[in-house]
From Swiss-Prot:
Its cofactor is Mg(2+); Ca(2+); Mn(2+); Co(2+). This is Transketolase 2. It comes from the Bacteria. One of its GO terms (biological process) is pentose-phosphate shunt. GO terms for cellular component: cytosol. The lineage of its organism: Bacteria, Pseudomonadati, Pseudomonadota, Gammaproteobacteria, Vibrionales. Homodimer. It comes from Vibrio vulnificus (strain YJ016). The gene is tkt2. Thiamine diphosphate binds at residues 65, 113-115, 155, 184, 259, 436. InterPro entries: THDP-binding (IPR029061), Transketo_C/PFOR_II (IPR009014), Transketolase-like_C_2 (IPR055152), Transketolase-like_Pyr-bd (IPR005475), Transketolase_bac-like (IPR005478), Transketolase_BS (IPR020826), Transketolase_CS (IPR049557), Transketolase_fam (IPR033247). Mg(2+) binds at residues 154, 184, 186. It holds the Pfam family Transketolase_C_1.
Length: 663
């Protein structure tokens, strides 16, 4: 059957889906249909009957607005995505949302739409493939051996994150990464030469990529030859495909008119005629389905891999068991009891250290049990303290390590980590100063949206970092992280809470965790075994009064010590004061009503929250009658102790505020 005819099935489904939804983007799917046909029918190793097959090739549609392209491909190839699912494009509770979303349609490897993040996730997937291969493959046993393919448009390349990711991909020599640039010269505003005149091939050559320029994106032979050349090269490859947006539309192709709106009934009829597609809306002939189906070939490919894995298992039983455990995302045997023992030992051996140092100690203790750790930092390892004795850096020539030097690329780092998590086999953690999570915010939001594990270590968490001043002092960042749905945010007060936060982040497979640590030393608090167990609840009674409290002090992180000292003074003066440490408000909010009431009794309305961050967040815990000692402005450049005094983080101020409140 004519290959153009098979590609036209994508074009027909794409324009029909967008038309029925009365919204969407037909241009990119119609322009990239020929490339997709060659890649998916000739090269992509996948099994529609098992989208989770560990050694499948990964395909990422970075220009996610062209989602009807991937939905059409999944449907035609034989995934569980019906023609009715395609008719439900962009409708409530459908498997085909406006942008591809991980966890909806089978075969969607990542959520894309925010441009540039798909290619960055793909870099993470390719890094995971290369690292897993280095850790598990043995001579004659290549059980990890797959490619990561990406489609991306001009918008992805204009986004700064594409520079961060593609630069690192070149440095690390990710030869199994193959990207197709949909060079159609059109964006929403029109022809891109007015705002995007980069020499893209030279840009990627400068990154150390293999670049194949000027490929006719509508010529199957040229596309196929480019893919063959890409697969044979040890460098990551950019295939520059010249395409016509909206290919086949007589009056709208080649213009921004077909980028982000339905073609309209008349134009669709004219396009069908132009393409020689004689079938009605959403109608695909059986013989076209037969040519497209990847079920038989995919099952055979997976069966062949299963045979390879059985031979590997016979030769290396322990490694094979470990591979299965890691790919399934399971924690090692006895994880729970060993981790709890580590935490108990910390409580029994007090240390007044910075929580960033406590974090490093937790990495040291837990890292020995977790070969799946893949750490990193955005060029701040000596400050974030993210390296431990078992850390080994990844290098282009040796990927057997477990630590990535991301360079100063916070956004790239975080989105790469999403790709590593999506690929499987690793528990990724990365780090920067809390202030610079701002650069990475959208990638953390994507982790929360996709429900993937992404552990961020954010150090230097307040005005407590001192002299570097307000450019580096976070104020509103902690609150903004807490406000993000499905984000777990921890601000521990000492080494014990820090270790608990790490343990829970490692166990949390259905969303990201932000672990927030101090630069300055923090005093360790006394606790019973029951109190240690209650840390996991996110908020607990750390110090209590004799009898019912008349005042509750709620604090996090570096301010817990302050709350305890103020409570001691108030208690000495005859006041009944309870101190609540609340390292994770999201965890506390998930506790049942009885527990929350036991910690914060509703009839005790005299409450003060103390945190060196924005004040507004805390009203939900102290009420309108309560008080908040926090930040209402940006910080200043000065030694930390002077700043804490200036902004009211003193025992004297807490005591005076309490007396005013109780009066």
């Amino acid at each position: 059957m004519d290959r153009k005819h098979l590609a036209n099935a994508i074009r027909a489904l794409s324009m029909d889906g967008v038309q029925k939804a009365n919204s969407g983007h037909p241009g990119a799917p119609m322009g990239m249909a020929d490339i997709a046909e060659v890649l998916w029918r000739g090269h992509l190793n996948h099994n529609p009957s098992n989208p989770e097959w560990a050694d499948r090739d990964r395909f990422v549609l970075s220009n996610g607005h062209g989602s009807m392209l991937i939905y059409s491909l999944l449907h035609l190839s034989g995934y569980e995505l019906s023609i009715d699912d395609l008719k439900n494009f962009r409708q409530l509770h459908s498997k085909t949302p406006g942008h591809p979303e991980y966890g909806y349609a089978p075969g969607i490897e990542t959520t894309t739409g925010p441009l540039g993040q798909g290619i960055t996730n793909a870099v993470g997937m390719a890094m995971a493939e290369k690292a897993l291969a280095a850790q598990f493959n043995k001579e004659g046993h290549d059980i990890v051996d797959h490619f990561t393919y990406v489609f991306m448009g001009d918008g992805c390349l204009m986004e700064g994150i594409s520079h961060e990711a593609c630069s690192l991909a070149g440095t690390l020599g990710l030869g199994k990464l193959i990207a197709f640039w949909d060079d159609n010269g059109i964006s929403i505003d029109g022809h891109v030469e007015g705002w995007f005149s980069d020499d893209t091939p030279k840009r990627f050559e400068a990154y150390g990529w293999h670049v194949i320029p000027a490929v006719d994106g509508h010529n199957a032979e040229a596309i196929n030859a480019a893919i063959e050349a890409a697969k044979a090269d040890p460098r990551p490859t950019l295939i520059c495909t010249k395409t016509i947006i909206g290919f086949g539309s007589p009056n709208k192709s080649g213009s921004h008119d077909c980028h982000g709106a339905p073609l309209g009934a008349e134009e669709i009829a004219a396009t069908r005629k132009e393409l020689g597609w004689e079938h009605g809306p959403f109608e695909i002939p059986q013989e076209v389905y037969a040519e497209w189906s990847a079920k038989e070939a995919g099952a055979a490919k997976e069966a062949a891999w299963n045979e390879k894995f059985a031979a590997y298992e016979a030769a290396y039983p322990e490694l094979a068991a470990e591979f299965k455990r890691r790919v399934n995302g399971e924690l090692p045997a006895q994880w729970e009891e060993k981790a709890n023992q580590i935490i108990a030992d910390l409580q029994a051996n007090p240390a007044n250290i910075a929580s960033r140092k406590a974090s490093q100690n937790a990495l040291e203790a837990f890292g020995k049990m977790l070969p799946e750790f893949m750490g990193g930092s955005a060029d701040l390892a000596p400050s974030n303290l993210t390296m431990w004795s078992g850390s080994k850096s990844l290098e282009a020539s040796d990927f057997s390590g477990n630590y990535i030097h991301y360079g100063v690329r916070e956004f790239g780092m975080t989105a790469i980590m999403n790709g590593i998590a999506l690929h499987g086999g690793f528990v990724p953690y990365g780090a920067t100063f809390l202030m610079f999570m701002e650069y990475a915010r959208n990638a953390m939001r994507m982790a929360a949206l996709m429900k993937v594990q992404n552990i961020q270590v954010y150090t230097h968490d307040s005005i407590g970092l001192g002299e570097d001043g307000p450019t580096h002092q976070p104020v509103e960042q902690i609150a903004s992280l807490r406000l993000t749905p499905n984000m777990s945010t921890w601000r521990p007060c000492d080494q014990v809470e820090s270790a608990v936060a790490w343990k829970l982040a490692i166990e949390r497979k259905d969303g990201p965790s932000a672990l927030i640590f101090s630069r300055q030393n923090l005093a360790q608090q006394e606790r019973t075994a029951e109190q240690v167990a209650d840390i996991a609840k996110g908020g607990y009674i750390l110090k209590d009064s004799d009898g019912k409290p008349e005042l509750i002090l709620i604090a996090t992180g570096s301010e817990v010590e302050l709350a305890v000292k103020a409570a001691e003074q108030l208690t000495a003066e005859g006041k009944k004061v309870r101190v609540v440490s609340m390292p994770a408000t999201d965890a506390f909010d998930k506790q049942d009503a009885a527990y929350r009431e036991s910690v914060l009794p509703s009839d005790v309305t005299a409450r003060i929250a103390i945190e060196a961050g924005i004040t507004d967040f805390w009203y939900k815990y102290v009420g309108f009658d309560g008080r908040i000692i926090g930040m209402t402005t940006f910080g200043e450049s000065a030694p930390a102790d002077q700043l804490f005094e200036m902004f009211g983080f003193t025992v004297e101020n807490v005591v005076n505020t309490a007396k005013e409140l109780l009066a």
